[in-house]
A protein has these predicted regions:
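Bacterial Sec-dependent N-terminal signal peptides
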Residues: 1-24
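Extended, composition-driven regions rather than compact fold-specific motifs
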Residues: 21-106, 119, 127-273
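Active-site recognition of the HExxH zinc-binding catalytic motif
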Residues: 110-122
């Protein structure tokens, strides 16, 4: 009887990390974080009823009646104690859509297809950033802390690319009103497919939705010392920590709000080699 009990417990333990991922919130009441099975909907554009007359005139002048607000969020968390090659920083990246700054006028829900493409462009940026960080880590022989050190520099370069692509799309499709939407959709889809291995995970979204580190024994990094070898008297790395902005109340796939998700054990590190 005992061996069956041990077997059942072993199966439960092996499955628990995968099952826990179903509990990760991928949005809040304020933000939607990019996921392949979560397209934007009219309900996500929550500023529609609170636009000023000036904003409405600007939208009418350019015939832009569906406008989303997007961002590319990043956060690095690090062990509070000793770092090793397998216990090092964890970088989270997620495209974010801000509900209360996005609007639809005159019932132009058809415009959501354009905003979804712009949201997908943010996901292209997220994947390119992960790819670049991974390449740098390989070149540095997987040195602990290297991704956190170069994160902001790499993000700035990716940000330039995404902004340029987004501006070109808006100019061609939304301002000039030409027929290049299909070409743009194909271009973005090609990027998403090419970098499919670097897609935004539910863990990335949950890091921002829950607004705290997901791993036990980890804390948020605001900035690292330029010389990463610098340590305090106890031998641990010196990390400057700072508060993270309010991201709202987590919304779970089962419709519940604010349900607690316990931190993972560092043994189940999602970046484990």
């Amino acid at each position: 009887m005992k061996k069956y009990l041990y077997f059942a417990l072993a199966v439960l333990y092996a499955c628990s990390p995968a099952l826990a991922q179903d509990d990760y919130p991928t949005e809040t009441d304020l933000y939607v974080f990019w996921q392949p099975d979560r397209p934007l909907t009219p309900a996500d554009f929550q500023k529609s009823d609170s636009l000023s007359d000036r904003q409405k005139r600007i939208s009418d002048a350019h015939a832009l009646y569906c406008v989303g607000c997007f961002g590319l969020w990043t956060q690095a968390d690090a062990p509070k104690g000793k770092w090793t090659r397998k216990r090092t920083e964890v970088v989270y990246i997620a495209p974010a859509f801000e509900k209360k700054s996005s609007f639809i006028l005159h019932g132009d829900t058809a415009g959501i297809v354009h905003e979804q493409l712009l949201f997908d462009l943010q996901e292209v940026g997220a994947r390119l950033l992960r790819y670049k960080l991974e390449e740098i880590k390989k070149e540095a022989d997987r040195a602990a802390g290297i991704q956190a050190i170069v994160l902001n520099t790499c993000k700035a370069k990716v940000r330039e690319f995404v902004d340029a692509m987004s501006s070109s799309f808006v100019a061609e499709v939304l301002i000039e009103k030409n027929d290049s939407l299909a070409r743009w959709r194909a271009l973005v889809d090609d990027y998403l497919e090419k970098y499919a291995d670097y897609a935004t995970r539910s863990e990335d979204c949950a890091r921002f939705a829950l607004n705290r580190p997901l791993l036990n024994g980890y804390s948020s990094i605001e900035a690292l010392e330029a010389d990463f070898r610098k340590r305090d008297s106890s031998g641990t790395y010196m990390i400057k920590q700072g508060p993270f902005p309010d991201t709202g109340t987590p919304v779970y796939k089962n419709g519940k709000r604010g349900r607690h998700v316990p931190p993972q054990s560092s043994e189940n590190d999602i970046r484990k080699e």
